[in-house]
Amino acid sequence: MSYASEVKKELTGITVHEKNARAELMALIRMNGSIGLANHAMILNVQTESPAIARRIYSLIKQLYKVESDILVRKKMKLKKNNTYVVRLRHHVQEILGDLAILDGFQIKERVPLDLLTDDLMIRSYLRGAFLAGGSVNNPETSRYHLEIYSLYEEHNEMIAEMINRYDLNARTTNRRSGYIVYLKEAEKIANFLQLIGATTSMLEFENIRIVRDMRNSVNRLVNCENANMDKVANAANRQVENIMLIEATVGLSSLPEKLRAIAETRLAHQEVSLKELGTLVPGGPISKSGVNHRLRKLNAYADELRQGKAI
């Protein structure tokens, strides 16, 4: 099961009171519902690919209106796609859609009733229904954090974004496949949205995975940085040894001033140690790291002069 499916499964298990159940059902029907005729009577079909969401729609209708509906299963044969589930309401359709402020003549309204936007719990419930109807969220294991809600109607999409942004979540909108989406890209905002709509367990899982992933990335960066520093130190030490050996072969280390000769001989004897360790090994030491570095730079410069024939 995908992470998005786990989130939706958790949401379908939330117990809601009548007012909030109404707001959630309002979103589910507005986004996934269609009106038809059967035997000269109006029917409502609400379609989903999730059996859990189909059961949720069925339960909400029964809870609010004490009306039974049918759940139909349509099998998709092509490409082994998921089945489609249709919750079909045959009785009291106009009354129920009127109560939900969804029906406009024989069409579903795009706008959400303004009185809904004044109640915090109803907004959260509506957003939960909207996510169940058209939402998806990337697995936090991936490097691309993304949560979106798809809607057929531009005005409805803008209103969903407005609801989300009441909670400072920086939701944005764009066009998508003959429809519209509202989306979140920031991990912290996605986690806050999941908590907002009631997916607390999924939010905690999201945060745990994200924290572990971020820590792993930080460790990798530190290791890479440490490896780069070690390579840099090793390359510098190799260059120092090569230059000291050149000096020894050309003019002999005995020709060097005492302090330079001491550091040169110590470096040849301890080629892999750091500058700090080298300073503790020099006869007559210890010498500070900066002091060791200063003397080695002098040896490097002297070796370069020997290569150019300037110091002989």
From Swiss-Prot:
Keywords: Cell cycle, Cell division, DNA-binding. InterPro entries: Homing_endonucl, Sporu_reg_WhiA_N_dom, Sporulation_regulator_WhiA, Sporulation_regulator_WhiA_C, WhiA_LAGLIDADG_dom. SUPFAM superfamilies: Homing endonucleases (SSF55608). Disulfide bonds: none annotated. GO terms for molecular function: DNA binding. Residues 274-308 bind DNA. GO terms for biological process: cell division; regulation of sporulation. Pfam families: HTH_WhiA (PF02650), LAGLIDADG_WhiA (PF14527), WhiA_N (PF10298). Belongs to the WhiA family. Involved in cell division and chromosome segregation. This is Probable cell division protein WhiA. It comes from Limosilactobacillus fermentum (strain NBRC 3956 / LMG 18251). The gene is whiA.
